[in-house]
Amino acid sequence: MLKRLLIVLTSLALMTGGMDPAGSFRIEEIPDEIFESMQGRSFNEPAPVKREDLRLLTVLYTDFEGCTQKGQIICNKKIADDLIDIFRELYENAYPIESIRLIDEFDGDDKASMRADNTSCFNVRPKSSSRSGFSSHAYGMAIDINPLYNPYVRTRDGVTRIEPEEAAPYVDRQKDFPHKIDSQDLCCRLFRAHGFTWGGAWRSVKDYQHFEKSLN
């Protein structure tokens, strides 16, 4: 109830400041200054997508302190409407997200972004599970939510790899702790309802932060 009240009060403050909260959830083509900042960070050649395939989203979200924040996401235009709908509903339900910042603010460093528990989408990089091929993030078709509490986990030849490494306390999904995404979590249910696959349901690896949609 308190979080919902904070959202209402913040929305009123936005309106008195002359900005329509509904307009805070919007989709636009990638502005020149944003695309320039992506060079050598999230956008590296060869890239599997072009600038015109991408969209910049602006969303509101509730942070871990229960306060309203504004975030930005770059994604493939094919999932832009899905993400706007999902993040609007997450916000309306005061779903806590620690950070939503463009990964370019971390110089395109996925590990640094995850350590900061930053939610992000587009980033031209290889698959985590192999040295060849692009990650679905490179197409802007995947997003990671609260990654510090929902790590990538892979065990091979008796060796367990955790990303980010700082997420080791959250690998045991039988434990109860805040910000854990499971199959009954609102975030998971919303993404699945929009046709996304959840990495936490994979067999060979577990990627609890990860939601992706097929490009085709």
Whereabouts are the PLM-identified features?
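Active-site-adjacent loop/helix surface patches within enzyme catalytic domains
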Residues: S99-M141, P147-Y152
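Generic structural hydrophobic/aromatic packing signal, biased to beta-strands
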Residues: L56-V59, I86, L90, F122, ...
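A generic structural signal for short, non-catalytic loop/turn and secondary-structure boundary residues
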Residues: D20, V49-L54, R115, S136-A138, ...
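Active-site acidic/histidine clusters and adjacent loop/turn architecture
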Residues: V49-M114
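N-terminal module-boundary/linker segments of secreted carbohydrate-active enzymes
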Residues: D20-C67
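Hydrophobic core
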Residues: T10-L14
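Sec-dependent signal peptide recognition
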Residues: L2-V8
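Catalytic cores and adjacent binding grooves of peptidoglycan-active enzymes
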Residues: K127-F134, G140-N216
